[in-house]
Amino acid sequence: HIIDRCVDEMSGFPEERFEWIKWTVETAQKVTDSIVAIDSSDSKTIYAGLEAHDGSKNRPAINSFNLEDGRQELVPMAKEHNALLFANASGNAGMPQNAEERVENLTTCMEMMDVDDIPMEDRYLDPLVFPIGAGPEFGMHYLDAVGTLRERFPEVHLFGGHSNVSFGLPQRKLMNDVFVSLSIQA
């Protein structure tokens, strides 16, 4: 199990976020043996969380690295802290528009992780699930990317926010269950 900790909405002031992430990481480690994923849009906040993490209990995880400006520094940070590393398919120009961009962006992320010798079993790839209510093709973009990534990188973990697929639609539970099943089969 992995528990995600994010404090980005707690404060607009970096110093306050650093204190909040330290507190939330330390508190989570007091009440669970689960891996703590340190999640922020700010690399310095992630670093503060990694510094507060007690590595004698378990390893931390970083959520998440992508091709957006400033996120690449998380790769050597993961190596330095022996952290699991989550990568998502967001590109330097923004969100991926199709399956091919998802695969291309995550392949580039994989190459960057290779440079820092991040072990394959420590890599988690998120092709990004978008709501099909906003675009019916979004479901297939994700599923096609999952299939290609599974073939290309069979030893890495694939994951995603599967419940995003049904956002704004009725029968969400049924749709989510079907989408998870399709993702497993992809």
Describe the role of every protein-language-model region.
Residues 73, 80-186:
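Catalytic alpha/beta core domains of metabolic enzymes, predominantly
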Residues 31-37, 56-62, 153-167:
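Short beta-strand/loop segments at the ligand-binding rim of alpha/beta enzyme cores
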Residues 2-11, 34-42, 59-69:
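Catalytic beta/alpha-barrel core
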Residues 56-79, 83-87:
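Active-site-proximal beta-alpha core segment in soluble small-molecule metabolic enzymes
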Residues 45-47, 176:
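Short glycine/serine/threonine-rich phosphate/pyrophosphate-binding segments
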Residues 1-9, 28-30, 55-58, 86-97:
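Gly-rich Lys/Arg/Thr-decorated short loops/hinges at beta-loop-alpha junctions or inter-strand turns
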Residues 1-34, 46, 129-139:
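Glycine-rich, proline-tolerant flexible connector loops at the mouths of alpha/beta enzymes
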